[in-house]
């Protein structure tokens, strides 16, 4: 996450991972927020339950921007109850076309019991492909590629979705200096 102004230091942080396996969906997020080389917070909560607990969302990027997007997603979920894909697509459309929203610098990882979506400001609503065993993994944030690789390596092993998420996030925290092991884990 980089600031738009050279007068502010770069903000980094956040690794969010979603794992779906055997009817269980988990989103895990680390707690670290860094400004340049300094950790400014180690216990941030970047994963939230929405829609009466039926949806879980994690965010990466500018915090205020992410909160704005979470609020917009909640409104879309009220407008389209039990239609997560439609709510995400409608949010992405608004995000891309609205003059105010298109300036927001964040990404969302959103899931219900049956699907996981990565939602971006350029209009992307991406659903991860399934593994041979039927599971799925998606990740965003500074350590997202590390968590994604670890999750994909673990998905077909005899582990629960939560165990995979915790192990993959632990691996990401060992590699990415902007990710810590202080996890928030929400399961559906």
From Swiss-Prot:
Its main location: cytoplasm. The keyword Protein biosynthesis does not apply. It is found in: Cytoplasm. GO terms for molecular function: metal ion binding; threonine-type endopeptidase activity. Keywords: Allosteric enzyme, Cytoplasm, Hydrolase, Metal-binding, Protease, Sodium, Threonine protease. Na(+) binds at residues 173, 176, 179. InterPro entries: ATP-dep_Prtase_HsIV_su (IPR022281), Ntn_hydrolases_N (IPR029055), Proteasome_sua/b (IPR001353), Proteasome_suB-type (IPR023333). The active site is at residue 14. GO terms for biological process: proteolysis involved in protein catabolic process. Its EC number is 3.4.25.2. One of its GO terms (cellular component) is proteasome core complex. The keyword rRNA processing does not apply. Allosterically activated by HslU binding. It catalyses: ATP-dependent cleavage of peptide bonds with broad specificity. Pfam families: Proteasome. A double ring-shaped homohexamer of HslV is capped on each side by a ring-shaped HslU homohexamer. The assembly of the HslU/HslV complex is dependent on binding of ATP. Protease subunit of a proteasome-like degradation complex believed to be a general protein degrading machinery. Belongs to the peptidase T1B family. HslV subfamily. PANTHER family: ATP-DEPENDENT PROTEASE SUBUNIT HSLV, METALLOPROTEASE TLDD. This is ATP-dependent protease subunit HslV. It comes from Caulobacter vibrioides (strain ATCC 19089 / CIP 103742 / CB 15).
């Amino acid at each position: 996450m980089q600031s738009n102004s050279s007068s502010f230091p770069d903000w980094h942080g956040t690794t969010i991972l979603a794992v779906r396996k055997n009817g269980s969906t988990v989103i895990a997020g680390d707690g670290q927020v860094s400004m340049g080389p300094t950790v400014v917070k180690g216990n941030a909560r970047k994963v939230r339950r929405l829609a009466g607990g039926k949806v879980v969302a994690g965010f990466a990027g500018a915090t205020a921007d992410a909160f704005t997007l979470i609020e917009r997603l909640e409104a879309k979920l009220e407008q389209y109850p039990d239609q997560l894909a439609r709510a995400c697509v409608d949010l992405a459309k608004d995000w891309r076309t609205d003059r105010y929203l298109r300036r927001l610098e964040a990404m969302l990882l959103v899931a219900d019991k049956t699907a996981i979506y990565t939602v971006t400001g350029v209009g992307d609503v991406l659903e991860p492909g399934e593994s041979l065993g039927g599971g799925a993994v998606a990740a965003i944030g500074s350590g997202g590629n590390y968590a994604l690789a670890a999750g994909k390596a673990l998905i077909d092993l005899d582990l629960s979705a939560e165990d995979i998420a915790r192990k993959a996030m632990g691996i990401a925290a060992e590699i990415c200096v902007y990710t810590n092991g202080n996890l928030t884990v929400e399961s559906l």
